[in-house]
Amino acid sequence: MSLQFTKYQGLGNDFILIDNRNEATPLLTPEQAVDICDRHFGVGADGVIFLLPATGETDYTMRIFNSDGSEPEMCGNGIRCLARFAADLEGHALTATPRYRIHTLAGTITPQVRSDGQVTVDMGQPRLLAGEIPTTLKPAAEKVIAQPLQVGGRSWSVTCVSMGNPHCITFVENVAAIDLHTLGPQFEHHPAFPQRINTEFIEVIRPDYLKMRVWERGAGMTLACGTGACAALVAAVLNDLSEPRATVELPGGPLEIEWSAPGQAVLMTGPAEQVFQGVL
């Protein structure tokens, strides 16, 4: 195999980016992605992202394979890295501010690279009905807000949000005390979530400042999750715990999230940085 790649990271959530613009099919298989993401015997990453040709009236298409070979609908930190990758491939100066329409399995997502190196992403509207998550915690046409869920021998109050991929959010007094390695898989594989679930544990420091830890479906514990931070802010607003705009602090650093009102899109702003280039 001789395939160029570039590694990017967004708040420590790291990805191998592949220039796939000349082929509509990913240049690597899910099985190859698992090997390449291995941090001991491969390059090491949370996932492999492919920049593919446009679909319909978009600029590019995004596909991603997680480190376990599964394919999520979307990845918030990943799409910021993809936008920075596209801008770099197109030869834009670091001060340029290109805006892209990216086709994903979750729909069209619109990131804009900013002159300060940050990327702001229009993540679209959150989906709140149980059938859209999906989850069996409530009837398909009802919202799942502060619903009890039995996990690990205790009852958790959970709120479910889809940002194109499924999230289960619970609010805790001390997020640092959560045994994520034990609870994460139990939430992810709970029978109430037929497509598995991303799980966010949130500590509300102030109405405009949330601390979060995440267990990602297919990737495990990561330093950051962009869609998870968006889902967390939405859940906090729905539970009257947060203002419409807040900083979500993750182990890898902060994201700025805004959801002005139900029916409106969620905006996410955060960094995306190139780490190194290589050849597989």
From Swiss-Prot:
Belongs to the diaminopimelate epimerase family. Catalyzes the stereoinversion of LL-2,6-diaminopimelate (L,L-DAP) to meso-diaminopimelate (meso-DAP), a precursor of L-lysine and an essential component of the bacterial peptidoglycan. It is found in: Cytoplasm. Pathway: Amino-acid biosynthesis; L-lysine biosynthesis via DAP pathway; DL-2,6-diaminopimelate from LL-2,6-diaminopimelate: step 1/1. The active site is at C75, C225. Its EC number is 5.1.1.7. The keyword DNA damage does not apply. It comes from the Bacteria. Signal peptide: none annotated. Substrate binds at N13, N66, G76, N77, N165, N198, E216, R217, G226, T227. This is Diaminopimelate epimerase. GO terms for molecular function: diaminopimelate epimerase activity. The record marks H167, E216 as: Could be important to modulate the pK values of the two catalytic cysteine residues.
